[in-house]
Every structure is written in structure tokens, then in C-alpha cells.
């Protein structure tokens, strides 16, 4: 497991680590101090993931803005 403040190499690795933390926390088997440490790491990973998603969204918007004919529309899963 990466050190406490170390950022995972990729969004996917961060998400995987976050899912593992959630599983451990949901098990209810962790001592309080360890659970708090895991929770803290999970919050950190969630924030890093959110930052990476925002950066990706900005890159897409920049790429689309270079094309004058392309229009940005908000993503909704119902639009297919």
C-alpha cells in the first residue's frame, strides 16, 4: 500500500485502493485508530480522484473548444 500522503500512479489505481479501503471499513473488523487512518486515506484518495476527473474534463473542454463546430453538452447517462 502506498504511504499515507503518496499519490497513486493512476486514477484507476487510486480508485482500486479506495474500493479496498471501503471494503475494510465496511467489514467493521478494524480497530478504531486503524479505521480512522483508513478513512483519512480514503478521503485523500477521493479528493485526488476528483481532481483528476476535473483535469480530464477541462482537457476535453479545451480540445472541443479548438473545434469551432463542436458544442459542449453536459453528460447525462440517459443520453445515448
Curated annotation (Swiss-Prot):
Keyword line: Cytoplasm, Exonuclease, Hydrolase, Nuclease
Q: Which domain of life is it from?
A: Bacteria
Q: Which residues form a coiled coil?
A: none
Gene3D superfamilies given in the database record: Exonuclease VII, small subunit (1.10.287.1040)
Catalytic activities: Exonucleolytic cleavage in either 5'- to 3'- or 3'- to 5'-direction to yield nucleoside 5'-phosphates
Protein's GO biological process: DNA catabolic process
Q: Which family does it belong to?
A: Belongs to the XseB family.
The protein's matches in PANTHER family, at most eight in alphabetical order, are given as: EXODEOXYRIBONUCLEASE 7 SMALL SUBUNIT
Q: Which HAMAP family match?
A: Exonuc_7_S
- Describe the task this protein carries out: Bidirectionally degrades single-stranded DNA into large acid-insoluble oligonucleotides, which are then degraded further into small acid-soluble oligonucleotides.
Its name, as the record gives it, is Exodeoxyribonuclease 7 small subunit
Q: What does UniProt list as this organism's lineage?
A: Bacteria, Pseudomonadati, Pseudomonadota, Gammaproteobacteria, Enterobacterales
Amino acid at each position: 500500500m502506498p504511504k499515507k500522503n503518496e499519490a497513486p500512479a493512476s486514477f484507476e489505481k487510486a480508485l482500486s485502493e479506495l474500493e479496498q479501503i471501503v471494503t475494510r471499513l465496511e467489514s467493521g473488523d478494524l480497530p478504531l485508530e486503524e479505521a480512522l487512518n483508513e478513512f483519512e486515506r480514503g478521503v485523500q484518495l477521493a479528493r485526488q480522484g476528483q481532481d483528476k476527473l476535473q483535469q480530464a474534463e477541462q482537457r476535453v473542454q479545451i480540445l472541443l473548444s479548438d473545434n469551432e463546430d463542436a458544442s459542449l453538452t453536459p453528460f447525462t447517462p440517459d443520453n445515448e
